[in-house]
């Protein structure tokens, strides 16, 4: 049913549907979970949508306004399961709960939206991906430049960047991978983000500069944004202001866990565009999965905090050699302790996200239990860390801290096995509060009291079927078989008649019931009060807890890299401010882990006198693997990891560009060749003398002569204008003549051994040129008919002899 039809003739709807439509009109773009007793029900278009998304039954809720009401529902106690699925699909949900009866005659229960869930603003553990950041982003464009802001409410992280091109924006979106993106209604580059699951057009008013400026200063209790480095940066102020305003409105509260704003200086890390990240398969493979990626090999962290941090590092390798060398030194120092440390770190819970829920006051009793168990192991962690002679590890140890006061509080205040929610009671530990213990004892003793009362009355009345029972509707009651009703005293009041029994009440039992129920209510109210006080007591420690979580994350990453270095036989790289890359007997970090035979090691030397390496050889001969492994080793070195090589010297690298693999972009009408030329154009315009450039088979998408001409001219541009460190693979033998023309070029090749129509690859790079591409021999491996291969061989001989 269309929205306009639903809204028409409101007077013809039932009171309940009127209430639903009124609430739904406030959240038109969200699924409205409308509580009806023990179920959340959805109606009309929402019902049809959730039925399709979750494959649940679509039924009907009678008629209203003379039309069938489509309906679908989920049990309240299983709602988190369904909410998790919907959030992963990019859906947003408004949770509408029952409040109280407002009209005794009509019995229409008051309802209101108590919670809004969007993919980018969730903090609940069950709705989050354990090992992934959960960013929401906002974009503002002005004068062909962009302000880009990201916020992870589950971690308390808030960052901004100034971006100078749409290509760089795409790269930053790929790096941060936001679950939700906000953009202004006049945004002209929607095509950059339209393929993502959850994008939201926002009014220009939400990006207002003055309002954004005030909001940010109010959030951080400042009078200027100078301290964050963005006072005059209107682009990022607009983006950050819109983002902050949106998250506050969705969260229906202030954001005490957002304590600082980090300006992301793009020049601090090695730049990699979207194409580079995709072709190198750093955290996602070509299919969008995590397997067979650099992250899959390197990320054996034992905490979810560490896993998230390592992926952040992999997406932003550093140019700051001081930080990188500190990490290398730490990885080396940890090599004798990684087993002990990983054993302890496995017991560390997600303190980073628990901190955020503490600040937002949404932490569950189980969060407190997890925090308590984490704080309990810190002394043992310190004992090991004190043995390690490393300045950086000492700095991490001091940031981790001890938190004896918080631990003491949690041990005294929180039960060993509390209930899931505070509303269920049983969260506050015994002996923490005398009044609470007394109230609880009333209920505990009630069983004994009821048992004694039952035995006494049973004996007095001599009724064998006499029993005292309880249910939530009528409370305590006496149940007696109908054959004994003649023995009932006059002061017994009948309250219910069943087929074979009757139920009674007596004043004494009712008085005791009120006493028990009153004690339960008072007990629960007191528990809630004490629970809130625990948040107040912990609040002064929140900033140190956040710092401790970050330190534990970094320790986990460094310990993990130390284990990887030992287990995978990695070498500590030398980071040099000088120009060039020297790798001796290097290996591909991912490919070597999946081979059944030993990986063939290869070296590479790039310097001011050898800036470009042209590589020839057969398809499947190892050219692409070789080029990728060099880039991956540079990335590994840049995050503080040891690398797969016997010796590695990495110079100052500012950007990595790759043009490897081919694909059409049919949605924008671009052919494979056009995509190739656009990517090459981007490289030629943006690569510097400190950039690493990897190009696979440039010019293959057009005629041989034109392709060769383009490859020749682009190569000369890279040599003489960009002066970048370049590896270029080709099947154009004529391109290798550049070695004679340009003094900075060197030819290398991968060779193979051919027998009849069969081929064996050697995977070893050597000086010189491979004059054959062995295309027909490689084609034979695909299963082409022998007659086709023989015909192709004859034609090749004919062409070569012409």
UniProtKB/Swiss-Prot annotation:
Keywords: ATP-binding, DNA damage, DNA repair, DNA-binding, Nucleotide-binding. SMART domains: MUTSac, MUTSd. Coiled coil: none annotated. One of its GO terms (biological process) is mismatch repair. Pfam families: MutS_I (PF01624), MutS_II (PF05188), MutS_III (PF05192), MutS_IV (PF05190), MutS_V (PF00488). ATP binds at residues 617-624. GO terms for molecular function: ATP binding; ATP-dependent DNA damage sensor activity; damaged DNA binding; mismatched DNA binding. One of its GO terms (cellular component) is cytosol. Belongs to the DNA mismatch repair MutS family. This protein is involved in the repair of mismatches in DNA. It is possible that it carries out the mismatch recognition step. This protein has a weak ATPase activity. This is DNA mismatch repair protein MutS. It comes from Buchnera aphidicola subsp. Acyrthosiphon pisum (strain Tuc7). The gene is mutS.
